[in-house]
């Protein structure tokens, strides 16, 4: 059994060059397929979709890196295993395959040439185009009829479906990464670095027991509730009348428990603040580095939103406004602020909460109404009409 395992391991190691070369060949074939599909799509459309071009260029870059890494793996493993096997014929065939892969990657950098600043700057979302003398729907209708009457309209539909699939997959993956990567990284840093560091410095250098006045008031309130519970149990006969020494020990034990709980709560509050700051920094770094995927995600969300009918759009508008700026939204904002204060360990301020609830929803409602008047009227007047009718 051991000898067979050793032979299998040796065989797997000796096949590393072939395995790396096959992986490089597969990545090069996918690279060429994406290039061909994007070229056909551009010829049929007669125009460059900057978002699609950005995404396909990103895909080509990934496959190109895969090919280079696999070829490097092939060269290194071949150099280390040289002399084990491989005849001159096999070496010649392998060399020919490597040259074909390198030529396929270096040939025809199609998307790199059309991905320029001018093409990206001149591209604007369809829903935000400025209105002119002729309504936008008329030229769009003629353009749609022209493309449907072309002999290559079926190819256009297939290519648009593939491009849409690319766009949807990368949008969902990027959206999931924006949610999970900052949370996972910040959680890992909190557990293994931030919280132990805060615990060490807090327990060594901190002289005061409580982080702020509100925390002290909660501890005192819990202490009074414990004392009242003890006396109540004695009065109703659920517990025997304790001696002063026993009562003092119980009160001291409860005080130590409350002190330890308050100390741990202070450490967790500081750790929450630090980990959330780290998560925000990671999110900002991702947004600044992944501008290509942001453009793809924005295009995907635009298509998703504008594909809804007017009644559905109006329904979501009413839902959002009623939740955040509606009559009962003040209670929701109060709960959110109290949760944030407890999460970060900030002292609760009723005056600040009342002032925030009295001003922020009003400001948000004003901004929303201005957005409807300034932008939504030009983008989708029918949605605005349905929205007002549903509100009435």
From Swiss-Prot:
One of its GO terms (biological process) is potassium ion transport. Contributes to K(+)/H(+) antiport activity by supporting proton efflux to control proton extrusion and homeostasis in chloroplasts in a light-dependent manner to modulate photosynthesis. Prevents excessive induction of non-photochemical quenching (NPQ) under continuous-light conditions. Indirectly promotes efficient inorganic carbon uptake into chloroplasts. It comes from the Eukaryota. This is Potassium/proton antiporter CemA. It catalyses: K(+)(in) + H(+)(out) = K(+)(out) + H(+)(in). It holds the Pfam family CemA. The chain crosses the membrane at residues 174-194, 269-289, 316-336, 352-372. The keyword Ribosomal protein does not apply. Disulfide bonds: none annotated. The keyword Transport applies. GO terms for molecular function: antiporter activity; proton transmembrane transporter activity. Keywords: Antiport, Chloroplast, Hydrogen ion transport, Ion transport, Membrane, Plastid, Plastid inner membrane, Potassium, Potassium transport, Transmembrane, Transmembrane helix, Transport. It is a multi-pass membrane protein. Belongs to the CemA family. PANTHER family: CHLOROPLAST ENVELOPE MEMBRANE PROTEIN (PTHR33650:SF2), CHLOROPLAST ENVELOPE MEMBRANE PROTEIN-RELATED (PTHR33650). GO terms for cellular component: chloroplast inner membrane. It is found in: Plastid, Chloroplast inner membrane.
């Amino acid at each position: 059994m051991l000898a067979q395992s050793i032979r299998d391991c040796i065989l797997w190691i000796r096949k590393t060059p072939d395995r790396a070369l096959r992986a490089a060949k597969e990545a090069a074939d996918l690279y060429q397929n994406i290039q061909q599909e994007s070229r056909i799509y551009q010829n049929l459309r007669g125009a460059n979709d900057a978002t699609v071009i950005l995404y396909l260029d990103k895909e080509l870059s990934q496959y190109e890196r895969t090919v280079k890494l696999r070829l490097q793996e092939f060269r290194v493993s071949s150099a280390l295993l040289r002399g084990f096997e491989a005849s001159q014929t096999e070496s010649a065939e392998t060399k020919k395959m490597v040259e074909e892969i390198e030529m396929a990657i270096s040939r025809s950098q199609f998307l790199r040439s059309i991905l320029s600043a001018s093409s990206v700057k001149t591209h604007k979302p369809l829903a935000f185009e400025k209105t002119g003398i002729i309504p936008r729907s008329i030229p769009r209708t003629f353009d749609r009829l022209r493309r449907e009457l072309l002999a290559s309209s079926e190819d256009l539909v297939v290519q648009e479906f593939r491009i849409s699939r690319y766009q949807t997959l990368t949008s969902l993956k990027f959206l999931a990464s924006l949610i999970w990567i900052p949370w996972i990284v910040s959680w890992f840093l909190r557990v293994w670095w931030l919280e132990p560091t805060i615990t060490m410095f807090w327990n060594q250098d901190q002289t005061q027991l409580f982080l702020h006045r509100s925390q002290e008031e909660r501890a005192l309130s819990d202490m009074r509730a414990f004392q009242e519970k003890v006396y109540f149990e004695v009065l109703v006969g659920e517990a025997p009348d304790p001696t002063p020494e026993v009562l003092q020990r119980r009160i001291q034990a409860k005080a130590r428990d409350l002190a330890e709980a308050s100390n741990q709560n202070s450490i967790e509050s500081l750790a929450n603040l630090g980990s959330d700051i780290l998560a925000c920094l990671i999110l900002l770094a991702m947004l600044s580095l992944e501008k290509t995927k942001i453009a793809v995600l924005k295009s995907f969300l635009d298509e998703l939103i504008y594909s809804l009918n007017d009644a559905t759009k109006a329904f979501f508008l009413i839902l959002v406004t009623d939740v955040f700026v509606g009559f009962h939204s003040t209670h929701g904002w109060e709960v959110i602020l109290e949760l944030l204060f407890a999460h970060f360990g900030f002292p609760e301020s009723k005056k600040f909460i009342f002032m925030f609830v009295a001003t922020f929803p009003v400001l948000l409602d004003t901004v929303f109404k201005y957005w409807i008047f300034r932008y939504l009227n030009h983008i989708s007047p029918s949605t605005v009409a349905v929205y007002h009718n549903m509100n009435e």
